């Protein structure tokens, strides 16, 4: 399957284990399916595809703390145990890995799989890996969804300096998307939720302003009402047909998400972002989503991994 993609690895069924406490298929490990041939995705039976991006090359290039390449499998392991409250069809399609700093190759191959799945009517729920997943994911979507906006829940803008031809990293994905949009003469629709004042330099705030980025600071989420926050999102998505939703786990406070490269002492609580995430899903405009930056070696008692799985489970159960 995907034999022409050297960095693709098929799913590992051993990750999907859990408690069998009823005769019914009530947990994710009992719902998950696997395929042997990509042609099995060319059907009218539409599925939600789990796809991992096992890379922390972008984090290493960004001088961060590595370990996120182990994130996808750990998220799958934790998701497997959770109750599943819907009858959707789920497929674990495996991972795209990154070895020997071949980040651009891995991003290209990940994008090809995303494009193939969406072209055949499926939805992607992807697990990182570093936030370099965002540039890979966007590349797979952009040609299929012309009026596509990006909403990123993140402590950082990830708009670090980037010029075409340079090597990207976990801090440049949205600069890469902006450059791509400029080349294609497309509007750059980018919204960042949970921005930390001391997680971004003044020049990054200036760049966000120059690129007309919509954003809410972490302080905004503490101080403003939920109705005000939803009105802000409404304003951003009003003229968009589709949304690519990406979640960087470092948007959350370190007590909830210690297992990330850049933990945030003043980060958000899960229930500050969950209503906004659910609202976006309920808008019907989200076509693809991912969750990034889980680093199992940096985690404490699986807190971050379990939280990542719970966030995914909540969103998959939102209609």
From Swiss-Prot:
A GO term for molecular function: manganese ion binding
Catalytic reaction(s) noted: N-formimidoyl-L-glutamate + H2O = formamide + L-glutamate
Cofactor: Mn(2+)
Record-linked InterPro entries: HutG, Ureohydrolase, Ureohydrolase_dom_sf
UniProt keywords, alphabetically: Histidine metabolism, Hydrolase, Manganese, Metal-binding
Gene3D superfamilies given in the database record: Ureohydrolase domain
Residues bound to Mn(2+) 2: 154, 156, 248, 250
SUPFAM superfamilies noted in UniProt: Arginase/deacetylase
E.C. number(s) listed in UniProt: 3.5.3.8
UniProt remark on cofactor binding: Binds 2 manganese ions per subunit.
GO biological process: L-histidine catabolic process to glutamate and formamide; L-histidine catabolic process to glutamate and formate; putrescine biosynthetic process from arginine, via agmatine
Stated role: Catalyzes the conversion of N-formimidoyl-L-glutamate to L-glutamate and formamide.
Similarity section: Belongs to the arginase family.
Record-given protein name: Formimidoylglutamase
Organism field: Legionella pneumophila (strain Lens)
